[in-house]
């Protein structure tokens, strides 16, 4: 995770510092693209190491389905999913208003009409997802992180998969068994959770819901 000032954090709903946008050139879904980033969000300088590790480890997304990205700044994950699977419905969930608007603007600039960026409360309660990719905001603290995962991981549709990237030294190895216990309590016998890979100090975690 990047360092942020004490006055405004990337997980605040409304960052207090005035917005300063800039254009960053990066590579998403095998394409060189230009995206808008800004201060007061996660990883404003471009693609962070954790998300890059996730991209290197996950299998290609299905061509169709309902996909979810939970909280990752200017949403390189959601943009990548929408670019790679143009017939899929991609939802980016964020609490940071600046990130939400950047995601919408970047999606529009890239012609991605299959991507919507929403606050958590605007996602229908009965919505389920075939695929979740996420670099969850570990620095929000354990209680808030657990609440976030409890809210979204059970939303996997039957046969769906979630892929998470968590830095090893930020608690990945203790988070995995907690995820397994939480899902077993919520839906006994329906979910499995495993460490799928390790990439440059990051754990890639995989959650699967049975069909």
Each language-model region and where it sits:
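Conserved class I S-adenosyl-L-methionine
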Residues: 167-182
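N-terminal auxiliary segments of SAM/dcSAM-dependent transferases
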Residues: 1-29, 40, 44
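Conserved SAM-binding loop and adjacent beta-strand
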Residues: 38-56
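A short glycine-rich, Lys/Arg-flanked "PGG" loop and its adjoining helix->strand segment in the class I
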Residues: 146-158
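Class I S-adenosylmethionine-dependent transferase superfamily signal
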Residues: 81, 151-152, 179
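Core SAM-dependent methyltransferase catalytic element
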Residues: 195-211
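Conserved beta-strand signature within the Rossmann-like core of class I S-adenosyl-L-methionine
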Residues: 159-166
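Conserved SAM/SAH cofactor-binding pocket of Class I
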Residues: 50-134
């Amino acid at each position: 995770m990047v360092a942020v000032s004490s006055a405004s954090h990337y997980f605040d709903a409304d960052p207090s510092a005035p917005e300063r946008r800039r254009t960053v050139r990066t590579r998403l879904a095998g394409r060189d693209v230009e995206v808008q980033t800004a201060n007061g969000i996660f990883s404003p300088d471009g693609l962070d190491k954790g998300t890059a590790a996730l991209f290197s480890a996950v299998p290609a997304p299905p061509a169709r389905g309902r996909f979810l990205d939970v909280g990752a700044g200017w949403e390189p994950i959601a943009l990548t999913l929408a670019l790679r699977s143009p017939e899929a419905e991609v939802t980016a969930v964020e609490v940071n208003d600046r990130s939400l608007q950047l995601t919408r603007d970047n999606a529009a600039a890239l012609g991605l009409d299959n991507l919507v960026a929403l606050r958590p409360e605007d996602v229908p309660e009965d919505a389920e997802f075939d695929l979740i990719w996420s670099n969850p905001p570990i620095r929000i603290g354990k209680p808030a992180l657990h609440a976030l995962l409890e809210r979204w991981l059970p939303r996997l549709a039957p046969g769906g998969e979630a892929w998470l990237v968590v830095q090893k030294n930020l608690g990945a190895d203790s988070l995995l068994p907690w995820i397994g216990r939480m899902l077993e309590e919520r839906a006994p016998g329906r979910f499995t959770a495993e460490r799928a890979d390790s990439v440059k100090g990051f754990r890639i975690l995989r959650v699967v819901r049975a069909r």
